Design a protein with these regions (language model features):
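Short beta-strand-loop/turn "lid" adjacent to the catalytic site in phosphate-handling enzymes
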Residues: 8-58, 77-79, 85-96
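General beta-strand structural signal in soluble alpha/beta enzymes
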Residues: 25, 56-60, 77-82, 88, ...
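Glycine-rich beta-strand-to-loop/alpha-helix junction loops that act as flexible
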Residues: 25-30, 144-146, 257-269
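Glycine-rich phosphate-binding loop of actin/hexokinase-like ATP-binding domains
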Residues: 86-191
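Catalytic phosphate/nucleotide-handling subdomain of diverse soluble enzymes
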Residues: 153-154, 159-195, 201, 264-295
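A mobile "lid/hinge" subdomain adjacent to the ATP/sugar-phosphate binding pocket shared
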Residues: 191-235
Length: 333
């Protein structure tokens, strides 16, 4: 971070800029404690450290970034923007797992959701693309990168999301399995003799597209599938099937859907994924304009047919802008 700050300082936009009013930090896990952007003081930083067991791969790096930025500009407010915060509006029945309540409460076992800054940005940007107030728009957001998640957003408020206590739940991802029968873990331990750490590594780092066909890059999966590779085709079909299931489920949750928005690396660039995911969903009001869908553009755009009841949008996400916007709004309110 110090090296980045030095590089930015060369053109006057670094941490030493007199125009700097805040430093925004992405913090992956806010638990139930942090449900909105928060100015960081010693107490807040200590609470973020306490959440490390819920995000052992991410929160330690987030803490380090905060510490470095505070040391460089102690006079400027540091703001934590939490990936989980946007999903904190889910009703309790959507956030709870159906396990023993005392055990769940004792170990903070519940659904938190992730990619929240992206889902927040894209849901608002989709409403703007439709020319309607965000409060009037119901949208299913599909954030499809190496990590992938879906959310159901009613009037700018998240009511359901696919990731759970960790980013492992939900859609098929580059290296993560997504939804899985929990008993698979018991089976692998009892019959396969795998340790907890080995199963953790298997499900998070060696599953998903990578586990099914040996590639986690959707471009390679598509190339191989197009050349007749059966394992790549199966991986692609499994990926798309899971997407369809979530689109259908979230259509039921929302009741009325105004748009389905695709975002992130795969969602923005892989027109084949969008086409396959929407194919066959005309009864839900979803029909693509195939030419518009295949055309590339860096701008937010509609790719649905003119007669479609539900818009299909491609909306490039901007998590950095969302973090900056939320941080600025907090310190200038």
């Amino acid at each position: 971070l110090k090296a980045v700050a030095a590089e930015l300082a060369a053109d006057g936009t670094g941490l030493d800029s007199p125009e700097l009013v805040a430093v925004g930090h992405r913090v992956v896990h806010g638990g139930t404690r942090f449900t909105r952007p928060t100015v960081i003081d010693d107490e807040v930083l200590a609470e973020i450290r306490k959440l490390i067991p819920l995000a052992p791969l991410h929160n330690p790096a987030n803490v380090t970034g905060i510490e470095v930025a505070r040391s460089l500009r102690a006079d400027v407010p540091q703001v934590a923007v939490f990936d989980t915060a946007f999903h904190s509006t889910m009703p309790e029945y959507a956030a709870r797992y159906a396990i023993d309540a005392a055990t769940a409460d004792a170990y903070s076992v519940r659904r938190y959701g992730f990619h929240g800054t992206s889902h927040a940005y894209v849901s608002r940007a989709t409403a703007a693309l439709l020319g309607r107030p965000v409060e009037d728009v119901n949208v299913i957001v599909l954030h499809l990168g190496n990590g992938a998640s879906a959310s159901a957003v009613r009037g700018g408020v998240c009511v359901e999301t696919s990731m759970g206590m960790t980013p492992l739940e939900g859609l098929v991802m580059g290296t993560r399995s997504g939804d899985l029968d929990p008993a698979v873990v018991f089976h692998l331990a009892r019959v396969g003799g795998l340790s907890v750490d080995e199963i953790d590594s298997l499900l998070n780092k060696k599953s998903g597209l990578l586990g099914m066909c040996g590639d986690n890059d959707m471009r390679e999966v598509l190339r191989r599938a197009g050349e007749g590779d059966g394992t790549a085709r199966l991986a692609f079909d499994t990926y798309v099937h899971r997407l369809k299931k979530y689109i259908g489920a979230y259509s039921a949750v929302l009741g009325r859907v105004d748009a389905v928005a695709f975002t992130a690396g795969v969602g923005e660039n892989a027109h084949q994924v969008r086409e396959a995911a929407i194919d066959g969903l005309a009864e839900l009001g979803l029909v693509l304009d195939l030419d518009a869908n295949a055309a590339r553009s860096p701008r937010p755009r509609l790719v649905s047919a003119d007669h479609a009841r539900v818009a299909v949008a491609v909306v490039p996400t901007d998590e950095e802008l969302e973090i900056a916007t939320q941080a600025y709004a907090l310190v200038t309110q």
